[in-house]
């Protein structure tokens, strides 16, 4: 296997799924049941979450604009659609990725002789496997594509005018209303070795770091390459517009606004995941 790559197929991560020879088109849920290729617009109906089943060793592929709907082979027909999750074998897929070309074959679990295929009219179907290029797909990690090496601001879901900010006279991270300061601007960078992200403050080029003490504060700190400086960034389970940031030192703990307060100067901490709004963040490019 080659070096870890952001587009490796990992459980619970979200991807664009494109023809291998045309990443300007992606799988698109164009109605409550129909799925086909469409021009890439980056909407939630074009983002797909992979859910791995360890017993079947296969994936469900859920669309992010309605996560009760998953990619389904309409057996015994050749067509595919999105349908309500019934846990049927026709709703699971083997994903076979070539780690050099990054091409993926999407093979149905119910009948492994059948693979997903796109047609010249952009419709999708299952067919017996051939060497044809229209049975090869690319998976592109949505968050990596959107955020890696980008300048961003992080807004708490608690209030539309409270942002992740370095304190004026210390390294401590707090909430503060937006005033277009370098203390509020962050460069998000992916690390292939850790398979996680760092967030670097533009003011001091120091990294968002979980300080493991009784307060569980977050500060900016010089790079130590410690897990406390790395974050798994993912969408909410059912919302591709909001994010949770999990600390790599303990992925049950996430970036959190203390006590759901919104006053300027409220501490940002790391706390156990519960998914409430004080752990939800909106990340916008600057």
Curated annotation (Swiss-Prot):
2-alpha repeats lie at residues 149-193. It comes from the Viruses. It is found in: Secreted. Residues 12-140, 180-284 form the Ricin B-type lectin domain. 1-gamma repeats lie at residues 101-148. Keywords: Hemagglutinin, Lectin, Repeat, Secreted, Virulence. Residues 256-279 are annotated as: Sugar-binding site 2. Changing residue 176 to A: Significantly decreased binding to bovine mucin, decreased binding to porcine mucin. No binding of N-acetyl-beta-neuraminic acid, significantly decreased binding to N-acetyl-D-galactosamine. The keyword Membrane does not apply. 2-gamma repeats lie at residues 240-286. Agglutinates human erythrocytes. The hemagglutinin (HA) component of the progenitor toxin protects the structural integrity of botulinum neurotoxin; may increase internalization of the neurotoxin into the bloodstream of the host. The hemagglutinin (HA) component is involved in binding to the upper small intestine through interactions with glycolipids and glycoproteins containing sialic acid moieties. Binds galactose or oligosaccharides with galactose at their non-reducing end. Botulinum toxins are produced as progenitor toxins of large molecular sizes of 12S (M toxin) and 16S (L toxin). M toxin consists of a non-toxic, non-hemagglutinin component (NTNHA) and the neurotoxin. L toxin consists of the M toxin and the 3 subcomponents of hemagglutinin (HA). HA is composed of subcomponents of 70, 33, and 17 kDa. The 70 kDa subcomponent undergoes proteolytic processing and is split into HA-55 (also called HA-53 and HA3b) and HA-22-23 (also called HA3a). The stoichiometry of the whole complex has been modeled as one BoNT/C, one NTNHA, three HA-70, six HA-33 and three HA-17. Arranged in 2 beta-trefoil domains (called 1 and 2) each with three tandemly repeated subdomains (called alpha, beta and gamma) joined by a short alpha-helix. Only subdomains 2-alpha and 2-gamma, in the C-terminal beta-trefoil domain, possess a functional carbohydrate-binding site. This is Main hemagglutinin component type C. It comes from Clostridium botulinum C phage. The lineage of its organism: Viruses, Duplodnaviria, Heunggongvirae, Uroviricota, Caudoviricetes.
């Amino acid at each position: 296997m080659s070096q870890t790559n952001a587009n490796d197929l990992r459980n619970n991560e979200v991807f664009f799924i494109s023809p291998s020879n045309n990443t300007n088109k992606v799988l698109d849920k164009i109605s409550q049941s129909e799925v086909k290729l469409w021009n890439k617009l980056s909407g939630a109906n074009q983002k797909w979450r992979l859910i791995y089943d360890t017993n079947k060793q296969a994936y469900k592929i859920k669309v992010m604009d309605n996560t009760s709907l998953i990619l389904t082979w309409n057996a015994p027909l050749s067509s595919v659609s999105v349908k309500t999750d019934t846990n049927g074998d026709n709703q699971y897929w083997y994903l076979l990725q070539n780690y050099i070309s990054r091409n993926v074959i999407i093979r149905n679990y119910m009948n492994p002789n059948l693979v997903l295929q796109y047609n010249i009219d952009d419709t999708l179907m299952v067919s017996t496997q051939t060497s044809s290029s229209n049975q090869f797909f690319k998976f592109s990690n949505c968050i990596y594509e959107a955020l890696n090496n980008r300048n961003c601001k992080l807004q708490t879901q608690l209030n539309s005018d409270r942002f992740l900010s370095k304190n004026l006279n210390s390294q401590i991270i707090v909430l503060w209303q937006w005033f277009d300061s370098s203390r509020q601007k962050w460069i998000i960078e992916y690390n292939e070795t850790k398979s996680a992200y760092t967030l670097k403050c533009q003011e001091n080029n120091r990294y968002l770091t979980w300080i493991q003490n009784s307060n569980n504060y977050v500060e900016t700190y010089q790079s130590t390459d410690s897990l406390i400086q790395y974050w798994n960034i993912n969408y909410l389970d059912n919302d591709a517009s909001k994010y949770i940031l999990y600390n790599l030192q303990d992925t049950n703990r996430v970036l959190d606004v203390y006590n759901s307060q919104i006053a300027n100067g409220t501490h940002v901490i790391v706390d156990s995941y519960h998914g409430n709004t004080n752990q939800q963040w909106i990340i916008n490019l600057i």
